[in-house]
Amino acid sequence: MKMKRRIAITLLCFACIMLLLLGRLAQIQLIATESFTKRHINLIEKSVTQRTQAFTLDDGRGHFVDRNGENLGEERYPVLVIFPFLQIKNDMLEKITHIIGVPGQDIKLQMKDKRKPFILQRGDKPFQLTKEQMEKVNRADILGMVAIEVKMKQISEAEHLIGVVGENEKELKKRYEKLKKLSSQTIIGISGLQQSFDEFLMTDGETKVLYQVDRQGEPIFGKRAKYTSPGNPFYPVTIQTTIEKSLQQKAEELVRTHGIKKGGLVLLDVKKSEIVAMVSKPSLQMNDKRAYQKTMENQMLTPHFPGSVFKTVIAAAAIDNDMIQSHRMFNCNTDPYGENFSQVMMGELNFTESFARSCNRTFAVLGDELMQKDKHIMETYLEALGASETVGWKGQMFHTSGFKQLIEEKKATVWNGEENKVGHKAIAQTAIGQKDVRISPLAIANMMATIARNGEKREVKAVKEIRYKNGTKFFYFEDHKLEGRQLSYSTVKQVQSLLRKVITMEKGTGATFQSLPLSVAGKSGTAQTGKEDRVNRWFAGYFPYENPRYALVVVDLETNSKENTVTPIFKEFVEEIAHLEGRR
């Protein structure tokens, strides 16, 4: 009796175990095939992947182009993709050698010890095929070799502005918690426009070339490779930026060759209020996390000490408040406080001469007089010149009311505390762009563009529009005006004249620009940084003076070099623009 009971219990246990195993098998094979375990593993995909050898041609993420439709940050290269696990015979190698002109031994060497598909290289770069070579390779129907265009990343123009992408599972979940089917390896935008426009750029699926193989690694469906893609006519999208690639490349070349370690330049289209070129140094370092964190900041969107460029704000305020008399002279032999001799003895100068030669004492005196009238006057006129708040395009974009194109941009600072507004020395330092004053190069460029437009303030665009894959328009960014006070026409005209005198006066700080093919108006600046002997050197201006088309800011930040790199960069860039315009 006991024996029968034991047998029954044993059989029951076996039956339960079998039921559990069958249940688990049913879960794997029938129920949870597309979302297995807490990690939501797609078992069907994994099964296909196991017997598939694939090479990704396009990750499916949206891409950026310049204002003329030229690619930024990536190119499509016609290359030879080799699947080394497939047995490529010698006669096939001879055939491919004859078509592309690469010795068979070189190809064999690259195939050695490789199991995954790869692109044939020449040195450290992909071997690029001609259109004719591509057609011949594919007509030859060689097992394991495919000639095709592949989307490849390259050193990006405007790398800080465009931004970088990467894997970040925590950030992915935070941004897209409702999209449960996203893989934890999904690429997202980490910085720049890649981050701002991430939800529009997200991949809808990869485009691949592949072979499906049996357990011996032999192709199941013959010699021809197969192609897979999402087949969506609308995605991925194209983001058309306002950048002009040729000018961007020239800007990067100038900043690099003149050795700016920290700083860069911003070029704006005055009439359209668009970024034409933007360079930030130091360059992005993607080698390791620490190096990236040190170089990730876009210096053109970050506020810095503006030095004497800020005198433009004081000048506008003084003119607008009828404080300028042509006969009034200022003692420019003293320091800003009127206590000691100045490092540069300029003698007695009137207001116009003081601006052209950048006399600190004049603007310290005017700043003090302005503050006696109104404790908020400096902030008021910085706003009137379009430089106090963030100046990048922002507004309604579909369901997002506060969408910002330039997500990393920071607004200007004039005062860190109200107590400084009553101290004469603090006021003097502030009036010459020191103390707590910080303004980004982009905001200063927008100030120059505002002056060039006779006081009309606008937000600055980095992106014109988004287009679907089929070329139709998805979203267009309309021009936006900056709200708030504007300078009177009369005041702006006088400020324009002052900026021009910086160049035309014999001893003006911009006199070296007199010989340029396009007439320039602008203001130089040198700011103490509080870091030993390091200074910020600036030149901000617009051109041509008679019919302004561009506003340009060049800045060398925290430099201890005796050599002024800002002036030659500004000069050579204006010459390049004049040359390009002459060819159009």
Predicted regions and their residues:
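Extracytoplasmic Gram-positive cell-surface binding/anchoring modules and repeats
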Residues: 303
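Beta-lactam-recognizing serine transpeptidase/beta-lactamase-like catalytic domain environment
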Residues: 60, 269-299, 307, 316, ...
